[in-house]
A protein has these predicted regions:
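Recognizes extended acidic, P/S/T-rich segments that occur
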Residues: 1-44, 50, 54-60, 77-81
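Surface-exposed beta-strand edges and flanking loops
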Residues: 4-6, 26, 35, 84, ...
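Accessory beta-strand-rich segments of carbohydrate-active enzymes
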Residues: 43-48, 53-55, 68-73, 87, ...
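Terminal edge beta-strands and adjacent linker/stalk segments
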Residues: 63-66
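Short, solvent-exposed loop/edge segments of extracellular or virion-exposed proteins
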Residues: 80-88
Length: 247
């Protein structure tokens, strides 16, 4: 039997805010449960399982564990796709930044981000991930993948800066080093991104920062990039402090 709640204390106290499955009879080490409650986006769920033997005289109670949902529906996104004002043939990589103010007593913060093709994103000058070439390749006119990051520890009280550099990847390939004729792909365009950060404060208030027309744009040291031929980087064009508060 499976027990689920959105607060750990509700699960421990078996309150009305938790719900449970019917007893699932099975001799396999797994079971499928069709919940009566639909999962909500951007929500942490706590769960616990109780298992009995066939006599129902002995039971095992699992520790309480949890999982978290992200953006379950396209309509959950409040951000919009953004890029700079250059066309697809302009080679320097787009740079985007957003300055915002965060209050004290932050409980948690999540960043949801997608790009076509790749993003290199920082918060207050520090990378939000150690991985590269995110997100994965798709047919961009049909489907786009996104990533979720816990950025709680990177937020500051006061001014914060979220910034991104966008790469062409397979979204904006150009001749003569394009593959599979992707320079003629139906989705080809200037790199772009969509993101949304939700900050939850300890008093229950929420703050959302999302991609929109208020973001600042520029170009910098990445004067050319290609998925196969690599990057051309001109350090003389680096903009000191672009991705940090106080710029």
């Amino acid at each position: 039997q499976l027990y689920i709640a959105t607060r750990e204390q509700d699960l421990r106290n078996s309150s009305d805010n938790s719900w449970q499955s019917d007893t699932i009879y099975s001799d396999t080490p797994h079971a499928t449960y069709q919940g009566s409650e639909k999962l909500k986006s951007r929500t942490r769920y706590y769960w616990q399982v109780i298992a009995w033997d066939k006599t129902k005289e002995h039971k095992i109670i699992s520790p309480i564990s949890s999982f978290e949902t992200a953006q379950l529906n396209q309509s959950d996104w409040t951000g919009v796709w953004i890029t700079d004002n250059h066309d697809k043939d302009y080679t320097p990589a787009p740079m985007l930044r957003k300055s915002f103010i965060a209050q004290d007593d932050i409980q948690q913060a999540r960043l949801y981000v997608s790009a076509a093709a790749y993003y290199k994103m920082t918060l207050n000058g520090k990378s939000i991930t150690s991985s590269h070439l995110n997100p994965g390749f798709t047919h961009y006119d049909k489907r786009n993948l996104y990533n979720t990051y816990d950025v709680t520890s990177q937020l500051l009280k006061g001014e914060n800066v979220l910034s991104a550099i966008l790469g062409n990847g397979f979204y904006n390939e150009s001749a003569p080093v394009a593959t599979w004729s992707y320079e003629q792909a139906r989705w080809r365009n200037r790199p772009r991104m969509i993101c949304e950060m939700e900050i939850l404060y300890k008093n229950g208030e929420k703050q959302t920062i999302h991609s929109d027309s208020t973001w600042k744009t520029s170009t910098g040291p990445y004067i050319q990039n290609n998925i196969y031929s690599g990057d051309t980087y001109d350090a003389c064009l680096a903009i000191a402090g672009w991705d940090k508060p106080g710029f």
